Amino acid sequence: MTGWKDIPPVPTAQEFIDIVLSRTQRRLPTQIRPGFKISRIRAFYTRKVKFTQETCSEKFGAIISSFPVLSDQHPFHRDLMNILYDADHFKVALGQISTAKNLIETISRDYVRLLKYAQSLYQCKQLKRAALGRMATLIKRLKDPLIYLDQVRQHLARLPDINPTTRTLLVAGFPNVGKSSFVRSVTRADTPVEPYAFTTKSLFVGHLDYKYLRYQVIDTPGILDHPLEEMNTIEMQSVTALAHLRAAVLYFMDISEQCGFSLKAQINLFKSIKPLFANKMVFIVLNKMDIKKFEELDPEMQQEINDLTKSGEVEILRASCATQEGVQEVKNHVCERLLVERVSQKLKAGTHSNGNIGTRLQEVMARIHVATPMDGTTRETFIPEAVKNLKKYDKNDPNRRVLARDIEEANGGAGVFNVDLRKDWILENPEWKYDKIPEIFDGKNVYDYIDPDIDAKLQALEEEEERLEKEGFYDEDDDLPDEEEEEILQKAEYIREQHALIRNEAKMRKSLKNRAIIPRKAVKKPLSQLEDHLDQLGVDTEAIGLRARAQTAQSSRGRSLVRSRGTTADPDAMDIDDGAASAKERLARSRSRARSVAATNRLQDGVQGTTLRSKAERQAKLAQRKMNRMARQGEADRHIHASMPKHLFSGKRTIGKTDRR
């Protein structure tokens, strides 16, 4: 299989430009402003240039890779393409595509380098325009190569799929000698048949089946008897097929000479192209026998035709495509000979010089070998006597065999009679057929748990238990735990409890409890915690406690809650200034008490620094924005309002009423 039919279409130069530029316009952003940063403007236009270059390279690479590489093709396909399309012209066209691809990549690199130094949007735009313009100019110059490659693609898709390695029959000869008629007769190929020469201008392929094997039949154009240099493209296709295909060659000759060429000329053509028949099976087919028989020829001409078979490599066959006389015989004979020849070639190729059969040949022989009995005796068909004497069932015969259907009809018919499904059960004891044992119990198959030796196994287990009881096996208390094991178990349980407590305390510490995480430096620790920690370290804390309490006493401020009311015990008595009170105390009592200030600012608790505080406020506003936009009363508001208020959408939308809806 060549895969030439899967080559995608090659666009023309103008179509190629439209594809590339429209793809660039569709796939990339299209808006840019002079006020943007110059780096952003450069990146915008650099991306356009590089994207266009990548698109061109991708398209050109796809075109180059889709066409076959001549050096990788079979010699037949390589020479056929050389004849039809001129291999040099084909290579030059693909080379121009590859050169254009490299030039476009060079242009892209140069203009990307220039775009790095552009100072304005106008400069970037002009550089981009120049780069894309140069790329488009290069593509326009590929007008002729692209048209040529698309024509080659179309012609390749129309070529027949010829397999050079399969079983092949190759039909050759002068024009109008009946080659296409033979191919139409033995295959389903619709080859053109007309009463004039050179009806077939290219290779046609048909397929036939012989002994469950597929053969391909190739109809070649007619060949004229002149030097190879003077042959045209149509004739060279036939010569290429004869030279490179391992096939059985059927050389057709028109002995009635109605083709316009004499029998002598047909014999001379056979001799001139005979070097192309090397290592091939050759058959001369004498066609149009219904018009003129071989025996009606001149003795000299008969002798010349018979001389062609002296080498032993050529056979003469006779047929008439008009009356189908001898056509199937020719087909069967050639296919059989070709099959035998291919098998012998495989056997010869798989045998080593020392006569041993290779591994590959053994695999092939294993596939084609048919096993037969070694003793040579004939094994006839054996039919038991009971089968021979078996009478045909007759419903009206009283001595007929009684079938289950007869029993059913005798006992009430279908729906009344229950078929005995256990009747034909094969059990060790026929009495077991009707035991009340369910097939399925608790969703399990009962038969899977039935053991024929279960009674013997149960008896053995009971005897073993009695023996163990007599030996005192169950009197030992080794399994009871001692004091050491109980102590180990208690310690293990205590360790598990401690681990659980530690884990729970860690979870409680880490949980926020609906509070913000306060930094360690902002947490105020009591003096008692400090004293406990220092006591654990062995530091005397008496002096530290006295100093802290003294600082606390000095920093205490505010009015005393108890005012001196002299010596009277009456709570309603008038305040009297004691002469012993200092002026400082009197001044403090005369001032009004200020509002109490909270110990900490809850709004700023847990947020350290102005930057973090402003960031937290912005995030809070951002979280609140959606709720405000959707007019929610809070986070728990899930009310869904009417999507189409009836007072706004009722009535008909008449002409002139849709501008307000």
From Swiss-Prot:
Keyword Magnesium assigned: yes
Stated name of the protein: Nucleolar GTP-binding protein 1
Function of the protein: Involved in the biogenesis of the 60S ribosomal subunit.
Low complexity: bias regions: 555-566
Region Disordered, annotated ranges: 549-578
Xref: InterPro entries: G_OBG, GTP-bd, NOG1, NOG1_N, NOG1_Rossman_fold_dom, NOG_C, P-loop_NTPase
Family matches, as Gene3D superfamilies: 1.20.120.1190, P-loop containing nucleotide triphosphate hydrolases
Keyword set includes Repeat: no
Binding, GTP: 173-180, 198-202, 219-222, 287-290, 320-322
Boundaries of every OBG-type G domain copy: 167-339
Any one biological process term the GO annotation gives: ribosome biogenesis
Alphabetized UniProt keyword annotations: Coiled coil, GTP-binding, Magnesium, Metal-binding, Nucleotide-binding, Nucleus, Ribosome biogenesis
Positions that bind Mg(2+): 180, 200
Main location: nucleus
Domain of life: Eukaryota
GO CC, any one term: nucleolus
GO molecular function: GTP binding; metal ion binding
Naturally occurring in which organism (per UniProt): Chaetomium thermophilum (strain DSM 1495 / CBS 144.50 / IMI 039719) (Thermochaetoides thermophila)
Family label: Belongs to the TRAFAC class OBG-HflX-like GTPase superfamily. OBG GTPase family. NOG subfamily.
Cellular compartments annotated: Nucleus, Nucleolus
